[in-house]
Amino acid sequence: MYTPSVEGIIEAAVKKRDQMNSNLSRYMVAALMAGAYVGLGIVLIFSIGAPLLAAQSPLQTMLMGMSFGLALTLVIFAGSELFTGNNMFFTMSTLAGRTTVKDTLKNWGLVFLGNLLGAILLSLLIVGSGLFKTAAPEHLLFVASAKKMAAPVSELFFRGILCNWLVCLAIWMAARTKEDIAKIALIWWCLYAFIASGYEHSVANMTLLSLSWLLPNHPDTITLAGWFHNMIPVTLGNIIGGALFVGMAYWYTSPVRKRS
């Protein structure tokens, strides 16, 4: 049913595996860039959302959601390696027998680490820029981070599933589309839905939570323990959303089976 598209994803995953194994340092730089690119989207939407929250504007969530498409547009069009996208890629390729479980776990671990390093690097640059040095405890950056750090684990897990379902659908649909304008529109809609609905994305949270914690003026509600409280269930949920709801689902509906 979706054989050409599934085969394209599988071939892309094989190339990712080969690039990772042939030159790890270059591959890690690509992962680092994705973490920073997603972080740029986070900085953008919270710069937009903070004054809207202060003004009690009902348009806050909508405008933040409309702006976050920058993140995945940079990841796809500029080129980089995103952990949550690779949840889909390597699930399909491993189910088809083109990569192994070891390849998959190695890739996910390395790309997650690279994304995290990129997010932290960007966060340090933002701290150095002074953009949020006068942010009060009620600033949207801190308010949103504190809520994420205190939310129930089960809710974070399910929000993670829903989030990466949308993110991987954006990548999947963009791969099935030839026109760049169509790709951008599809990315925009899916990321708008993810932000406006309040779902949880591990790579986006790498910048949001790290930046909030690294800012010297952060309130006591922002803690390193809260960072892990959010990141662990969200990451697990993202894996399920991308691997099961998109990767496994579309592989199962196609006739691609263990091709060499």
What are these regions (language model features)?
Residues 1-260:
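Alpha-helical transmembrane segments and their helix-helix packing motifs
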